[in-house]
């Protein structure tokens, strides 16, 4: 694998919406308040507004005369059809849209708004401009062609899809054909057994898929916001099967999908439940110090467990930790507090406690509005304008299979983003013990995504710096989920690595080397060096203390 200098990768993420905003929620009143603020600025500074209106008028005049001063992003698939550039009507319509988009962006950028209000205005007008894109109308050339080719049936199917989504999907277009998948059938289908269950989780032990296995097991901690089978999708995308085929012992946590009865489950509850799963893993494997892997909020829970064990002088029960797109340092370089203030945070806590849970569908909606062109308008065109069935992608099915968060954990996560407690010793207390991550002297391997809009890579990088021990950091050229599900064989995949961790993410990036392909083989080399000798695997799952309770994927994952 040839190393190349890292080039063309942004030094900082460009998003202003992230996981903090997703769990906080997005209220209509906040958007209306932003619109009012923009209107006030327009009235207070009429010369500024007039300047941009004149500029817009001049550009529209050039468009009417047939000039094409603006070009869409060549990577924007919305306008890839040749009709947008070859047909005079469509070309002028696209140019007018691009001119409007440019001037609204410049008006906001050059306004007297402060940084936070400017970020809110950009977010609001990005939503508006994305919605107003001419590709979202029935005049979309692809929709017109499909209408004629189908004899009008595409419109009939599109209206049927729209009515169904209004009734059954909260008015958002479906992203996936759910009929194509079944949990335990063609998803989460790797053979194994539930070997431990408590009120919050089930522990799955997988059957070996190699002639020999390493002695030290790996315990995987998925995020609580979604279900565990992000690690066990279809066979070609299954991280679990990749690990098993390469000789690793794998245990998997499957979190229970809580309901209002479980509103008091907080971070300490999850850490305590995870510690019980760790004990079961140690007992069944006969190994005193398993390796751990955590993703997103699962990584936060895993770090809290390690800090808890360290405070009890029991950190020897863990050998190493792998963090996948996990935030431990919740400070963002971009304006992360987009619509977050003390009043909004407390209102979000009260709302979820009254309901008992934060509905996963609500979180999914916010995530969708973070990337509306990819996650909303793309499917608007496909499902409604073209009248097509949404695609059958395993990752999209998993994404739609959302879970709830208990109110107490929701409140703990909001406080985590508000207070950033892990950046100083004893800033966070879990299960009655203060947490100091610098004292967690374990080998760690951290993965972030350069295009991650949920957990920005520079914040994940700073999170790695909070840990003690020997640390590795890898930056994949993917988004949040694709940074985890990164199987070998993707010709577009690459990652950046630099063994020297600087205090500044930009400095690390400047000296990082680019390697083609997936980061999985690099991590496999790292983890196998910490997984003990190879030995013949046991033929039976569980043991006398923890007998099998049922086949994988268990029962908790099936709860909607």
From Swiss-Prot:
The active site is at residue 296. Transmembrane segments: none annotated. GO terms for biological process: poly(3-hydroxyalkanoate) biosynthetic process; poly-hydroxybutyrate biosynthetic process. It comes from the Bacteria. Its EC number is 2.3.1.-. Pathway: Biopolymer metabolism; poly-(R)-3-hydroxybutanoate biosynthesis. It is an enzyme of class 2 (transferase). SUPFAM superfamilies: alpha/beta-Hydrolases (SSF53474). InterPro entries: AB_hydrolase_fold, PHA/PHB_synthase, PHA_synth_II, PhaC_N. Pfam families: PhaC_N. Keywords: Acyltransferase, PHA biosynthesis, PHB biosynthesis, Transferase. GO terms for molecular function: acyltransferase activity. P.oleovorans accumulates poly(3-hydroxyalkanoates) after growth on medium chain length hydrocarbons. Large amounts of this polyester are synthesized when cells are grown under nitrogen-limiting conditions. When nitrogen is resupplied in the medium, the accumulated PHA is degraded. Belongs to the PHA/PHB synthase family. Type II PhaC subfamily. Synthesizes poly(3-hydroxyalkanoates) (PHA), complements a mutant of P.putida that does not make PHA. This is Poly(3-hydroxyalkanoate) polymerase 2. It comes from Ectopseudomonas oleovorans (Pseudomonas oleovorans). The lineage of its organism: Bacteria, Pseudomonadati, Pseudomonadota, Gammaproteobacteria, Pseudomonadales. The gene is phaC2.
